């Protein structure tokens, strides 16, 4: 890889990391190619970006994105997205499926370093769509009860 290619990769990653709401670093040592492709396909469908990056390039990109230093070692795969919950769910589900060869190392949520426990706890939260559904259910409940009451009143009057 030429120096110019490395510069382009670092610039691209710096912009991506700066715009991402969440970044998770995982160890993938021992994963087979088809398992890695499964992670990529699942991630792609959830608008999550996945890339294996050299640690030196990743450190430079993270520094350029004004994020805290992560002190990266060994083999790392980087996953990042705008939705922290969706990213956490995908990564934790995959880690549960392939726990012998895939493990979470560290994360950055809103440019703050988070540990594995935090990532797992975020993965247990309802998704954005589920939260919107819950909110709509709460908002429509009074109208639904009012209509049900009117319908019961109508049925009662028809019986009498």
From Swiss-Prot:
Cellular-component GO terms for this entry: ribonucleoprotein complex; ribosome
Source organism of this protein record: Helicobacter hepaticus (strain ATCC 51449 / 3B1)
One Gene Ontology MF term: large ribosomal subunit rRNA binding
Pfam families for the chain: Ribosomal_L10 (PF00466)
Top-rank taxon: Bacteria
One GO process term, biological-process aspect: translation
Keywords: Ribonucleoprotein, Ribosomal protein, RNA-binding, rRNA-binding
DNA-binding found in the keyword field: no
Keyword Ligase in annotation: no
Known role: Forms part of the ribosomal stalk, playing a central role in the interaction of the ribosome with GTP-bound translation factors.
CDD domains (alphabetical): Ribosomal_L10
Family as reported in the entry's similarity comment: Belongs to the universal ribosomal protein uL10 family.
Signal peptide: none
Subunit note: Part of the ribosomal stalk of the 50S ribosomal subunit. The N-terminus interacts with L11 and the large rRNA to form the base of the stalk. The C-terminus forms an elongated spine to which L12 dimers bind in a sequential fashion forming a multimeric L10(L12)X complex.
Protein name as annotated: Large ribosomal subunit protein uL10
NCBIfam families per record: PRK00099.1-1 (NF000955)
């Amino acid at each position: 890889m030429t120096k110019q290619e490395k510069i382009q990769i670092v610039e691209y990653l710096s912009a991506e990391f700066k715009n991402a709401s969440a970044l998770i670093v995982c160890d993938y040592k021992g994963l087979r190619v088809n398992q890695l492709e499964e992670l990529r396909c699942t991630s792609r469908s959830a608008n999550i970006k996945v890339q294996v990056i050299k640690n030196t390039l990743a450190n430079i990109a993270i520094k350029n994105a004004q994020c805290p230093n992560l002190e990266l070692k060994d083999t790392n795969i980087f996953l990042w997205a705008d939705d922290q919950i969706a990213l956490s769910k995908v990564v934790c589900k995959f880690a549960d499926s392939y726990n012998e060869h895939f493990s979470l190392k560290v994360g950055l949520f809103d440019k703050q370093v988070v540990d594995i426990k935090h990532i797992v706890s975020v993965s247990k939260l309802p998704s954005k769509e589920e939260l919107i559904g819950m909110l709509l259910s709460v908002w429509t409940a009074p109208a639904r009860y009012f209509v049900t009451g009117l319908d019961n009143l109508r049925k009662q009057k028809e019986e009498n």
